[in-house]
A protein has these predicted regions:
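N-terminal basic/disordered segments at the start of proteins
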Residues: 1-19
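Active-site-facing alpha/beta catalytic cores
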Residues: 27-28, 32-268
């Protein structure tokens, strides 16, 4: 249901009726896993989305690069340091970042830890997004604090506009206490579908539609290094109904991207 809701929201973005805001770490790690870090990422994205909504007068679809973004695509299977060559670091869910032979040995147990961390992160995000932490007035106060301390009024005009809107709604009796939409947000998760065995293990059949969904995230994408038309990543992604993206780099050719889109989404 959540993936379908995101797909509908992204359709609004494609039609120019909404904005997409996606943000988060390049790669999550075990060492930096902490509720405060998750809270801060969530908080910043909420602050940014409020400013975008106020400036453009359009809804903002909020997607975090979080709760599963562990794997790192590498250009080479090995790396050298001080004359020593070791297997490349592939992400905390595969091997360790430390430049030692022991750390660079792939360990399947890391997948269980990554799964557990992702589940905990998602549960905390759901609590933040639905439990009152995302109260519109609170997000506005965060922005006001940022403006007063950091930017010397650079964005004061926008925040004054938000203050006036909140005051008007409150005068009309529309408050977070009696309107759930003012104290909750829809927040979605995303990551690159790089490690196919893990993504396959997380794929389930929707009993109501018979469609396949990758339950490791709401939104997944194919990376610049793995978007070969005859490759496994395109083959996997064409079989799931999640909303998805294709990363396009400097080497991307328009005709190639069109072919990939036709394979992944032949219905459109």
């Amino acid at each position: 249901g959540e993936s379908r809701s995101l797909k509908k929201a992204l359709a609004e973005v494609a039609e120019g009726k909404a904005y997409l805001l996606q943000g988060g770490d390049c790669a999550e790690s075990f060492a930096e896993f902490h509720p405060d870090n998750i809270r801060d990422t969530f908080k910043v994205l909420l602050q940014m989305s409020l400013v975008l909504t106020a400036s453009a007068s359009m809804p903002v679809v909020k997607v975090g690069r979080i709760a599963g973004q562990f794997s790192k695509p590498r250009s080479a299977p090995t790396e050298k340091k001080d004359g020593k060559e070791l297997p490349s670091y592939l992400g905390d869910n595969i091997n360790g970042m430390e430049f030692t032979e022991k750390a660079r040995v792939p360990d399947a147990k890391r997948l269980f830890r990554a799964y557990s961390q992702s589940a905990s992160t998602l549960n905390l995000i759901r609590a933040f997004s639905q439990g009152g932490f995302a109260d519109l007035r609170q997000v506005h106060l965060w922005n006001l604090g940022f403006i007063n301390k950091k930017t010397k009024g650079k964005y004061k005009e926008i925040e004054d506009k938000i203050s006036d809107a909140l005051s008007f709604m409150e005068a009309c009796g529309i408050t977070p206490e009696n309107n759930r939409r003012l104290r909750t947000v829809n927040f979605y998760t995303s990551h690159e579908a790089l490690l196919l065995p893990f993504e396959e293990a997380m794929t389930r059949v929707d009993s109501t539609t018979g469609e396949y969904h990758d339950t490791s995230a709401h939104f997944v994408w194919i990376g610049d290094r793995t978007r070969q038309l005859d490759g496994g990543h395109v083959e996997f992604c064409r079989g799931i109904e999640n909303p998805m993206g294709i990363k396009c780099g400097p080497t991307s050719k328009p005709e190639e991207i069109v072919k990939i889109c036709n394979v992944i989404n032949p219905k459109n």
